[in-house]
Amino acid sequence: MTVSGTATGVRVRIAPSPTGEPHVGTAYIALFNYLFAKKHGGEFILRIEDTDATRSTPEFETKVLDALKWCGLEWKEGPDIGGPYGPYRQSDRKDMYQPYAQELLEKGHAFRCFCTPARLEQMRETQRAAGKPPKYDGLCLNLAAEEVTSRMAAGETTVIRMKIPTEGSCDFTDGVYGEVSIPWDSVDMQVLVKADGMPTYHMANVIDDHLMKITHVARGEEWLASVPKHILLYRYFGWDQPVFMHLSLMRNADKSKLSKRKNPTSISYYSALGYIPEALMNFLGLFFIQIAEGEELLTMDELSEKFDPENLSKAGAIFDIQKLDWLNGRWIREKLSEEEFQARVLTWAMENDRLKEGLRLSQTRISKLGELPDLAGFLLKSDLGLQPSDFAKIKSPPEEILEILNTVQPDLEKILEWNVETIEAELRAIADRMGKKLKVVVSPLFVAVSGSSRSLPLFDSMAILGRSVVRQRLKLASQAVAALVGSK
């Protein structure tokens, strides 16, 4: 693998999109880049890729930054601290991309496309029906300049697509996969600039990496197939390309892709349950090093010393929660002094005002302080230990309870801002759609979220716990009720 960078030295970046809860996969890629920079005396920067304006939110951006800081990762430049190559948020760089798009058009490396979404969907359906992978068919590829000018003057919506060679292959060396060859005829004529003038990921990514002097691009293997598009853009602009490294995806124990449907994937979930950041980074860092059994407990500095990007495996990194639990326990017992442990517990309990909010809601509901653990203890528990019998006391039959739980889970994912008001509004809407009284819908949720049919107010409790913890508790509740249904 080529390590030498430019005159500025090795520069790597993590470039998350603020479109959802911060994912452990983001921490995994960020840690690799951080260790790579640390190993080679380089610089690690953070850039927010928010070209998807419909899904990106300031709330999610804040959560991403907070989550990566919680992980102990420090960047030299970023949207929160600035730097010499800013802005570090792509939406703030929109005007910077326009001259490059115009350059591609003038040099004949790109073209304007007027195809409507309906026409493109019909094209894809036809291709799929014929057993072909969907990609643009080139209808607008050779439009005359006069027609393009006329249609734009008439106000037709247009995007800019890149031209792709029709023969041969794109051959390149990847830092993990070695020599890679991808036929050009399998590469789509990628949209570079959307109808609203915002660049797509591919366009902005290449331009930003060049302008920010990124020397090594380490990202997930799902981007390997996009490398030909990126290499082509570097060639079109006459720029030196960085070294590409595509890391294997994190997977569940059954080798399936890590997803929130099977395992908790949000960094905030692990923070909320009391995992300590050093243990999570230790766990993720083990995927990047070679060690003997018994040497697993490592600090960030020790991970950096043992870090060896030359020995990365193409096999999927298995996210084994049991191993993470074991490692987290060892960190608590072996790495923290009594004083540090006590401080961590207090910090964790007060994090996100969880304990403060729990106490506020409890004050009018107790007569003795000793009643607090039974009433609000669920806010601090990592596992409620739900059993099928916990749901047997609910008046609704098990089949109806299971239907409610299975309906609520995907619908709650639609909530953009997770708070008491939005949670209540969504649950009321769900009850209306299901044709049920709100009480019928929320009764099993009380048990799922708190472990009891009598607890603190449900909507407040869900807001305090956070989306990722609620998601996991509802999933476990569904499993418990499914067992109850199966036993009948």
From Swiss-Prot:
ATP-binding recorded as keyword = yes
Q: Where is this motif: 'KMSKS' region?
A: 257-261
Q: Which GO terms describe its biological process?
A: glutamyl-tRNA aminoacylation
PROSITE patterns given for it? AA_TRNA_LIGASE_I
Identify the domain of life.
Bacteria
First-level EC class? ligase
What positions carry the motif 'HIGH' region?
Answer: 16-26
The Gene Ontology CC terms held by the record are: cytosol
The reactions it catalyses are: tRNA(Glu) + L-glutamate + ATP = L-glutamyl-tRNA(Glu) + AMP + diphosphate
Q: Does the keyword Ligase apply?
A: yes
Molecular function terms from GO: ATP binding; glutamate-tRNA ligase activity; tRNA binding; zinc ion binding
Write down the EC number.
Answer: 6.1.1.17
Keywords (A to Z) from UniProt = Aminoacyl-tRNA synthetase, ATP-binding, Cytoplasm, Ligase, Nucleotide-binding, Protein biosynthesis
Q: Name one Pfam family in it.
A: tRNA-synt_1c
Subcellular localization(s) per the UniProt record: Cytoplasm
Its predominant location is cytoplasm
| Positions bound to ATP | 260
Instruction: Give the quaternary structure.
Output: Monomer.
User: Could you tell me what this protein does?
Assistant: Catalyzes the attachment of glutamate to tRNA(Glu) in a two-step reaction: glutamate is first activated by ATP to form Glu-AMP and then transferred to the acceptor end of tRNA(Glu).
Family affiliation: Belongs to the class-I aminoacyl-tRNA synthetase family. Glutamate--tRNA ligase type 1 subfamily.
Q: What is this protein called?
A: Glutamate--tRNA ligase
Gene that this polypeptide is encoded by: gltX
